[in-house]
């Protein structure tokens, strides 16, 4: 835990058969996975806010573009810590074929632009927890996906979706565990 990673530019990447996440930011080692296991009740992880110091991990100012991934456990996984979100990231021009698509936790000011998601598990395709200032522009998913976007947590705010056909999914959005629909702007 700790250290700064910032001002990184990555482009023109082809990946195949990635056993974990194709694109991953951050680690919060002490968090309970917010995905409920069989028989468990889904709830937000209990977190202990720590003061920001030299041990606080910092991930910010990334630009990743022109990525093709054929096979991964998860396409994009972003997980910050409550006291220091992963922030200021642009992810664009991607085709990601994976079991799960996008999982964002404790993140701020993230732009997802022109991304095609082909995922085996579609409930949800995009999962957002305790994050703010996210923009989803030109996101494409498979017709008949179960749930396009799931938003969780009372700190999930200022989410924008534009140029995206939400009707591809059986259910467009869900708001859980304190997330509210008024924080979503669909254009």
Sequence positions of predicted segments:
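Extracellular/periplasmic carbohydrate-active domains that bind, remodel
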Residues: 1-187
């Amino acid at each position: 835990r700790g250290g700064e990673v910032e001002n990184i530019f990555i482009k023109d990447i082809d990946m195949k058969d990635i056993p974990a996440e194709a694109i991953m930011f951050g680690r919060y080692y002490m968090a309970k996975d917010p995905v409920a296991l069989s028989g468990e009740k889904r709830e937000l992880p209990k977190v202990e806010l720590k003061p920001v110091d030299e041990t606080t991990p910092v991930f910010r100012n990334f630009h990743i573009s022109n990525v093709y991934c054929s096979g991964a456990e998860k396409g994009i996984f972003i997980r910050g810590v409550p006291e220091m979100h992963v922030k200021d990231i642009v992810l664009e021009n991607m085709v990601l074929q994976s079991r799960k698509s996008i999982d964002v936790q404790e993140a701020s000011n993230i732009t997802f632009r022109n991304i095609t998601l082909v995922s085996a598990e579609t409930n949800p395709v995009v999962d957002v927890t305790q994050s703010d200032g996210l923009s989803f522009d030109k996101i494409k998913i498979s017709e008949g996906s179960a749930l396009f976007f799931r938003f969780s947590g009372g700190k999930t705010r200022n989410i924008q979706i534009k140029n995206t056909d939400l009707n591809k999914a059986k259910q467009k959005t869900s708001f859980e565990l304190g997330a509210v629909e008024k924080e979503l702007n669909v254009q």
